[in-house]
Amino acid sequence: MKKWILIFAAIALQLSLSARTIYVTRHGQVGYPMKEIRETRLTELGVSQAQSLANYLVKDLKFKGNIYVSPFYRTIETASFTGKLLDQKLILEPGIQEVATYPVPTPPGMSFAKIESYFPGLTVPGKRFVDQWRLCNESHLERNKRVAKVLDIILAEDKGDILFVGHGASVVSLVQALNRKIVLREVRKIKGIAWNCALYIFELNDQDQVTGGKYTTSYMADRDITNNFRCPLIERPDDSRYMTRAQDKADRAKKAKAAQGKTSGKKTEKNETANTRKNEEK
């Protein structure tokens, strides 16, 4: 009995020492995922998601901290609704940008002048923002290291509440990095899928250790929860813009089979070349 009392007392002490809150979210819905290597705007639903998120953050959670945003149009547009409610500027942070994990053409990122033309008076360049901020292809491990490093730098520089607005991949890396700051076994990791505008909430003490938090999409209806053009929580046979779960599964299986075919084709070609050389030597 005493053991449980001590455990609960320790948890209560950690929670009471919560000094600030860190919020992490992904941009609102955009179109087909391959467009993510270019500058895409939010769809009508994406705008609605961003507005719902902003209202929840500012009106329900009373968020008043700084907003760090990946310098893509879709992330800035998502964060702009929260920024406007707070009447504050967004901080452009290339450290939480999205980078492809496979070889693709990497277009240059928008310059600050270009961003300012789209969002006049709403953004400021962060300390790490330069006009050549766009990164090239990187592995998952490289992304995790990059994002974790930037997170630690920002937490050291900014001691208030913070909202990060990133992408599916960079949000996952941010959440992993923050979960590693849990020191008590009694504090559970914050888990949840990075849907468009889903929200991860981390409570930190004055040593930047995570003492609690949660994941939520409560401010959006299930029908409005998306992974860009996919709508994973419910079937959408009535709307051709979205894949149903069955279509999604079939699409993934088709792509996996095609990728496997390319790999086996390369192996066959390699073996044929080797056999040809052997015959020539004979």
Language-model features and meaning:
Residues Y118-L141, G168-A169, S173-V175:
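Flexible, surface-exposed loop/gating regions in the mature catalytic domains
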Residues M1-W4:
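Positively charged n-region of N-terminal signal peptides that target proteins for export
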Residues T21-R26, Y68, D158-S170, L174:
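Beta-strand elements within well-structured catalytic alpha/beta cores of enzymes
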Residues R20-E93, C136-N144, K149, R252-K254:
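Active-site-proximal alpha-helix that buttresses catalytic centers in soluble enzyme cores
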Residues E98-F112, Q176-K282:
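Acidic, low-complexity terminal tails and accessory targeting/binding regions
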Residues A9-L17:
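Hydrophobic h-region of N-terminal signal peptides that target proteins for export
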Residues N55-R128, R188, G192, Y200:
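Phosphate-coordination/substrate-recognition cap region in phosphate-metabolizing enzymes
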Residues D60-F63, I154-G160:
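Glycine-rich phosphate-binding loop signature in dinucleotide/nucleotide-binding domains
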